[in-house]
């Protein structure tokens, strides 16, 4: 897998984490098997009794849906920015217990499922 494929896989997995609840069961299953579990199109097609083309089309449509959700809601990009700010604050104020506690609370809110 080349660098671009790895980046796309990581992005799709991240978007899936944020927006999975907005997808249909079929979309969730296909994306999770393809990106998270590294199934091939043929393996997914066999699992669901459909053609590889049907799986491919569904995955491509779902990728666009996930990107559209992100363009409108910015949940993933906002999370990345918050994480970078928290990391920076932790690095610059390692002895400020009050600040560390508040960052910990905010981080736990971001990481709730």
From Swiss-Prot:
This is UPF0122 protein M6_Spy0905. InterPro entries: RNA_pol_sigma_r3/r4-like, UPF0122, UPF0122_fam_protein, WH-like_DNA-bd_sf. It comes from Streptococcus pyogenes serotype M6 (strain ATCC BAA-946 / MGAS10394). Belongs to the UPF0122 family. Might take part in the signal recognition particle (SRP) pathway. This is inferred from the conservation of its genetic proximity to ftsY/ffh. May be a regulatory protein.
């Amino acid at each position: 897998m080349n660098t671009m494929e790895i980046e796309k896989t990581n992005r799709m997995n991240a978007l899936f984490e944020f927006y999975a609840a907005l997808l249909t069961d079929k979309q969730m299953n296909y994306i999770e098997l393809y990106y998270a579990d590294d199934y091939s199109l043929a393996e997914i097609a066999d699992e669901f009794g459909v053609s590889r083309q049907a799986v491919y089309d569904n995955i491509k449509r779902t990728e666009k849906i996930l990107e559209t959700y992100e363009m409108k809601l910015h949940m993933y990009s906002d999370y990345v920015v918050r994480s970078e700010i928290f990391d920076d604050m932790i690095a610059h104020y390692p002895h400020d217990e009050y600040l560390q506690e508040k960052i910990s609370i905010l981080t736990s809110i971001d990481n709730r499922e």
